[in-house]
């Protein structure tokens, strides 16, 4: 596809785009460096962007346990909302640890939890009500309960001093916010939040709830916490397909709504770092990273930025990927796998930018630098 850069321009609210030289450096970083694990464990909370299969065990329509999901994981659908690996799988490789298993899987117990657990659940939001239109899901609050269950088990598996050190060196990743908009605020036919709250007030509601749980992580003894912001949702096929803007343009009104949340989350990270001795909270600038990819697709090897590889209708985003649907053959040239989620190739770029990137990608330090702090 011949993308028109002027038409595709993503407005990213003042964020600085990465220079071509930085792009080249990030893309040339090795996929996996053999050696000692950089962290003892990684605990993952979030939504479908990082779900590793928890929703397979819930009564919900938000599932990805069927082909063509997993087509590039030896045709094995695991519940990941991707053609292959998620952001977390690829970050785990960079950290040189196994990808954390899903909490809801009955086999996630014993020694299997020692290097971390994934609690993420498709359709989950910061607010309990977000995503209810899909059925069962573990909200942020429930995922925190599930995390505490795991920590109680781990406490019995090591000495008190070792447990304290283990928690302090482990990494926590939280990926929330998308469903509070896509499956709440931007669905006025099902939710009244857009009537009750102006965009800044809704963002403040989300941030206050988020802050409470981020502080809870500190009280539990966790000290390294990575918090990616929300991507430019107005550019995903699902939102393009609504017909608010031409099909080759992002929905700017949606992206503008997200600005307050992302800016507030970055400010919250500053506040948390000031009031949490010995901890490091890091903001991941997903909005800018995706915006950079969409504005400069050729620099990353992409040729299709405005429609899904697997989906139906306008932008292949009106109906998301269906069981046994035939996806596009050139998946590494697509930014979006289905109506909502990036391809494995796009996830790989996001993971590398989080791990190696400058402060415009990960603030105030990147994930690699986080692992070196004690």
Curated annotation (Swiss-Prot):
Keywords attached to this entry: Glycoprotein, Hydrolase, Lipid degradation, Lipid metabolism, Secreted, Signal
Keyword match Lyase: no
Signal peptide stretch: 1-28
Major subcellular site: secreted
Family annotation (Gene3D superfamilies): SGNH hydrolase (3.40.50.1110)
EC number: 3.1.1.-
One annotated GO biological process: lipid catabolic process
A Pfam family per the record: Lipase_GDSL
Statement: the UniProt record of this protein carries the keyword Secreted: yes
Location(s) in or outside the cell: Secreted
Active site: 48 (nucleophile), 338, 341
Stored InterPro entries: GDSL, GDSL_esterase/lipase, Lipase_GDSL_AS, SGNH_hydro_sf, SGNH_plant_lipase-like
Family to which this protein belongs: Belongs to the 'GDSL' lipolytic enzyme family.
Name of this chain's protein: GDSL esterase/lipase At1g71250
Organism name: Arabidopsis thaliana
């Amino acid at each position: 596809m011949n993308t028109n850069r002027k038409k595709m321009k993503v407005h990213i609210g003042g964020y600085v785009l990465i220079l071509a030289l930085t792009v080249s450096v990030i893309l040339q970083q090795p996929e996996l460096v053999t050696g000692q694990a950089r962290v003892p464990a990684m605990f993952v909370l979030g939504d479908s962007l990082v779900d590793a299969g928890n929703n397979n065990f819930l009564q919900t329509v938000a599932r990805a346990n069927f082909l063509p999901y997993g087509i590039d994981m030896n045709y094995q659908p695991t519940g990941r909302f991707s053609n292959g690996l998620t952001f977390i799988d690829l970050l785990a490789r960079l950290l040189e640890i196994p990808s954390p298993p899903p909490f809801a899987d009955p086999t996630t117990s014993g020694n299997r939890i020692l290097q971390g657990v994934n609690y993420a659940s498709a359709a989950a939001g910061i607010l309990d009500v977000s995503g209810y239109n899909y059925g069962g899901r573990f909200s942020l609050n429930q995922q925190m309960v599930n995390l505490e269950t795991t920590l109680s088990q781990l406490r019995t598996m090591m000495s008190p001093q070792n447990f304290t050190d283990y928690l302090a060196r482990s990494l926590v990743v939280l990926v929330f916010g998308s469903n509070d908009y896509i499956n709440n605020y931007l669905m006025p036919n099902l939710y009244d939040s857009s009537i009750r709250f102006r965009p800044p007030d809704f963002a403040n509601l989300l941030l206050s709830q988020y802050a409470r749980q981020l502080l809870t992580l500190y009280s539990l003894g966790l000290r390294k916490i990575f918090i990616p912001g929300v991507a430019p949702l107005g550019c995903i096929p699902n939102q393009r397909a609504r017909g608010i803007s031409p099909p080759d343009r992002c929905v700017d009104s949606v992206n503008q709504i997200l600005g307050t949340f992302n800016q507030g989350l970055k400010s919250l990270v500053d506040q948390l770092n000031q009031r949490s001795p010995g901890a490091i909270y890091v903001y991941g600038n997903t909005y800018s990273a995706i915006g950079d990819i969409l504005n400069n697709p050729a620099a990353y090897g992409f040729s299709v930025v405005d429609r899904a590889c697997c989906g139906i209708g306008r932008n292949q985003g009106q109906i998301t990927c269906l069981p046994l649907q035939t996806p596009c053959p050139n998946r590494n040239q697509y930014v979006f796998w289905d109506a909502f989620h990036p391809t494995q190739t796009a996830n790989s770029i996001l993971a590398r930018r989080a791990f190696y990137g400058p402060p415009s990608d990960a603030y105030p330090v990147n994930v690699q630098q986080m692992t070196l702090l004690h």
